[in-house]
């Protein structure tokens, strides 16, 4: 695997190997007074974010530093992009500066693929490119950490019924999770108003429903999504209040879930809209576990791309 741009870059076997690798990194760090492994010593990892981020950017930076990499954060607002430099020139500059890995978030779908194409393969000195979210396309490492969290909470993903609820249309998280969870044997159902479903969703490996209340009793997990108002230029639903009434996860709706079911959210959460504060803070919600798993999962991805399928270094 040269890059991680899409869930399509993975097979079921390689996805499970990454989940296992993440848990090995978690174990390797347990009990260490200094959370450092020498695995990526001498490697240069650059995070290049053209959109705001807290969880993804920070967890990639922590992952790189815990593996002893030199981590450099390239902010679009303080780079030559703000002066009109093209994405290609920026990417080639970072390659020339010695990046071993480029972790890219960009508002345009396909941006990470283009950067990987421009900068070349590792075989000819190019960096590994990791898609940290490209427009409404994909966010593969988020799906991987969500799958890891589900596996830890549910024991196995095979045969589980998992709902992805909310703004499917604008969500790269929904796309990556639908592909990965289906690959791992889950039954995935998308729950959203018709206006927030993408064209062509019938080709996805999922079923579609419009009533959240009807789905909750039969679920093993529910992944709540934020309404991405910043990507909307029209009326996709009458009001925030009506959206919350129909698709928000309230305490009453939480009680409809089976006792073992778990609630996930990729963040940031809009409390009071897609999820009630009491639900967000419930022990049945795995939001902080997702963040913790995000660090270990991204350690695994960096390791696989830059080192290969070897044992975790001491």
Curated annotation (Swiss-Prot):
Record GO cellular component, one term: cytosol
Q: Which domain of life is it from?
A: Bacteria
BP-aspect Gene Ontology terms: 'de novo' pyrimidine nucleobase biosynthetic process; 'de novo' UMP biosynthetic process; amino acid metabolic process
- Listed InterPro entries: Asp/Orn_carbamoyltranf_P-bd (IPR006132), Asp/Orn_carbamoylTrfase (IPR006130), Asp/Orn_carbamoylTrfase_sf (IPR036901), Asp_carbamoyltransf (IPR002082), Asp_carbamoyltransf_Asp/Orn-bd (IPR006131)
Q: Which PROSITE patterns match?
A: CARBAMOYLTRANSFERASE
List positions binding L-aspartate: 83, 172, 226
Q: Which UniProt keyword terms apply here? A: Pyrimidine biosynthesis, Transferase
Keyword Cytoplasm recorded: no
- Quote the EC number: 2.1.3.2
Q: Which reaction does it catalyse?
A: carbamoyl phosphate + L-aspartate = N-carbamoyl-L-aspartate + phosphate + H(+)
UniProt GO MF annotations: amino acid binding; aspartate carbamoyltransferase activity
**Sorted alphabetically, which Gene3D superfamilies does this protein's record hold?**
Aspartate/ornithine carbamoyltransferase
The pathway is: Pyrimidine metabolism; UMP biosynthesis via de novo pathway; (S)-dihydroorotate from bicarbonate: step 2/3
Q: Which residues bind carbamoyl phosphate?
A: 55-56, 105, 139, 142, 267-268
The record's top EC class is: transferase
The record's function comment reads: Catalyzes the condensation of carbamoyl phosphate and aspartate to form carbamoyl aspartate and inorganic phosphate, the committed step in the de novo pyrimidine nucleotide biosynthesis pathway.
| Assembly behavior | Heterododecamer (2C3:3R2) of six catalytic PyrB chains organized as two trimers (C3), and six regulatory PyrI chains organized as three dimers (R2).
What is stated as this protein's family in its record?
Belongs to the aspartate/ornithine carbamoyltransferase superfamily. ATCase family.
The protein, known as: Aspartate carbamoyltransferase catalytic subunit
Q: Which organism is it from?
A: Rhodococcus jostii (strain RHA1)
């Amino acid at each position: 695997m040269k890059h991680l741009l899409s869930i399509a870059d993975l097979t079921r076997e390689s996805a499970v190997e990454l989940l296992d690798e993440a848990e090995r990194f978690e174990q390797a760090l347990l009990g260490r007074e200094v959370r450092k492994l020498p695995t990526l010593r001498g490697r240069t990892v650059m995070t290049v974010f053209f959109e705001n981020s807290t969880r993804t950017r920070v967890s990639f930076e922590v992952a790189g530093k815990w593996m002893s990499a030199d981590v450099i954060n390239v902010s679009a607002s303080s780079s030559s992009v703000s002066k009109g430099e093209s994405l290609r020139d920026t990417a080639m500059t970072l390659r020339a500066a010695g990046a071993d890995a480029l972790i890219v978030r960009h508002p345009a779908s396909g941006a990470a693929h283009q950067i990987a194409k421009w900068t070349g393969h590792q075989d000819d000195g190019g960096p590994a490119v990791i898609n940290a979210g490209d427009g409404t396309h994909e966010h593969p490492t988020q799906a991987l950490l969500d799958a890891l969290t589900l596996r830890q909470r549910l024991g196995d993903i095979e045969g589980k019924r998992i709902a992805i609820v909310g703004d499917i249309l604008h969500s790269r998280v929904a796309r990556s999770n639908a592909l990965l969870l289906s690959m791992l044997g889950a039954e995935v159902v998308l729950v959203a108003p018709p206006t927030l479903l993408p064209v062509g969703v019938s080709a996805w490996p999922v079923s579609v429903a419009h009533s959240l209340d009807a789905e909750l009793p039969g679920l093993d997990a529910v992944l709540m999504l934020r309404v991405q108002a910043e990507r909307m230029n029209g009326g996709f639903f009458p009001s925030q209040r009506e959206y919350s009434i129909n698709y928000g996860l309230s305490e009453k709706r939480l009680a409809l879930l089976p006792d073992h079911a778990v609630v996930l959210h990729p963040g940031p959460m809009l409390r009071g809209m897609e999820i009630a504060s009491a639900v967000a803070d419930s022990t049945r919600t795995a939001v902080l576990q997702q963040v913790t798993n995000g660090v270990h999962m991204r350690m695994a991805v960096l390791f696989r791309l830059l080192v290969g399928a070897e044992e975790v270094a001491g």
